[in-house]
Curated annotation (Swiss-Prot):
Family statement: Belongs to the acetaldehyde dehydrogenase family.
SMART domains: Semialdhyde_dh
Keyword Transmembrane helix recorded: no
Known EC number: 1.2.1.10
Example GO BP: catabolic process
Xref: SUPFAM superfamilies: Glyceraldehyde-3-phosphate dehydrogenase-like, C-terminal domain, NAD(P)-binding Rossmann-fold domains
InterPro entries per the UniProt record, alphabetical: Acetaldehyde_dehydrogenase, Acetylaldehyde_DH_C, NAD(P)-bd_dom_sf, Semialdehyde_DH_NAD-bd
GO terms for MF: acetaldehyde dehydrogenase (acetylating) activity; NAD binding
Pfam families in UniProt: AcetDehyd-dimer
Enzyme class: oxidoreductase
Keywords: Aromatic hydrocarbons catabolism, NAD, Oxidoreductase
Catalytic activity: acetaldehyde + NAD(+) + CoA = acetyl-CoA + NADH + H(+)
Official protein name in the record: Acetaldehyde dehydrogenase
């Protein structure tokens, strides 16, 4: 087994803390540092107890060190990452961005991870994107998708102030991902914050317009194959029932339609299981980081043999 890549987590909130627990299980990545700005942060306290070096002095502290990480996962805010990203690049640190900054290409593991393994900075799109774009991709790789619409319903309890402040950005970024990554010619995204108590787990509905002569069996199989792929890093990702095919009607805009229903239950590492919307972000980020590390080791090995 090759040496693990050293990792710093920038941000010490709920997402960063959940990500930490996932990275501690990784065979390819070694979390060494957690950076925040609040000295009383529970995330920093937990990281210290788990043996990480921590600081509340932000990115300046990390980049001033003689030993720098191979990779950084950033779960702060878009404006913080926009400032820090050029500095990571200058220091030769690979960046995985869990904010809406979207400086690097958006990555949805089942759809386009292999295309961006050498990118210096990759963006994890949005939680709704991670849950629904794989399904749009599953359909669009079989048939043309002129229009796709996703509706992400998440527990209000799992949506913090950052999510609430960025609802418009969420819909814009996710809609773009449905098109650019999912493969739909036109995309739309809707998010619903459900105030139900006890909190409900994340549920998503994906509508794709399809040709009249679409092969329903091939689409269904493609959907199931992609669900299985997502389950390799998010075991709680599942179809609620078989894809539903509908004839054109006034309700669906006169399109032949396939509708896919999924739910996402979190692993409960740090965040509660109902917060599948946050869990799929951290799990996907860990997956991307591990694949980048695996590719780097493979490239190094090939170079050494040559």
């Amino acid at each position: 087994m090759a040496d693990k890549l050293s990792v710093a987590i920038v941000g010490s909130g709920n997402i960063s803390t959940d990500l930490l627990y996932k990275l501690l299980r990784s065979e390819w990545l070694e979390p060494r540092w957690m950076i925040g700005i609040d000295p009383e942060s529970e995330g920093l306290a937990r990281a210290r107890k788990l043996g990480l070096e921590t600081s509340h002095e932000g990115v300046d502290w990390l980049l001033a060190r003689d030993e720098k990480p191979d990779m950084v996962f950033e779960a702060t805010s878009a404006y913080v990452h926009r400032d820090a990203a050029p500095r990571y690049a200058e220091a030769g640190i690979r960046a995985i961005d869990l904010t809406p900054a979207a400086i690097g290409p958006g990555v949805i593991p089942p759809a386009n991870l292999r295309e961006h393994l050498d990118a210096p900075n990759v963006n994890m799109v949005t939680c709704g994107g991670q849950a629904t774009i794989p399904m749009v991709h599953a359909v669009s790789r079989v048939v043309d998708v002129p229009y796709a619409e996703i509706v992400a319903s998440v527990s209000s309890a799992s949506a913090g102030p950052g999510t609430r402040a960025n609802i418009d950005e969420f819909t814009k970024t996710t809609s773009a991902g449905v098109e650019v990554i999912g493969g739909a010619r036109r995309g739309k995204a809707i998010i619903i914050l459900n105030p139900a108590d006890p909190p409900m787990i994340m549920r998503d509905t994906i509508f794709c317009a399809i040709p009249e002569d679409a092969d329903h069996a091939a689409i269904t199989q493609s959907v199931k194959d992609v669900v299985a792929e997502v389950q390799t890093y998010v075991p709680g990702y599942r179809l609620l029932n078989e894809p539903q095919f509908d004839e054109p009607s006034v309700v669906n805009g006169g399109n032949h339609l396939v509708t896919i229903f999924v739910e996402v239950e979190g692993a409960g590492d740090y965040l509660p299981p109902y917060a599948g919307n946050l869990d799929i972000m951290t799990a996907a980020a860990a997956k991307v980081g591990e694949e980048i590390a695996r590719e780097r080791v493979a490239t190094s090995t090939t170079g050494a043999q040559a």
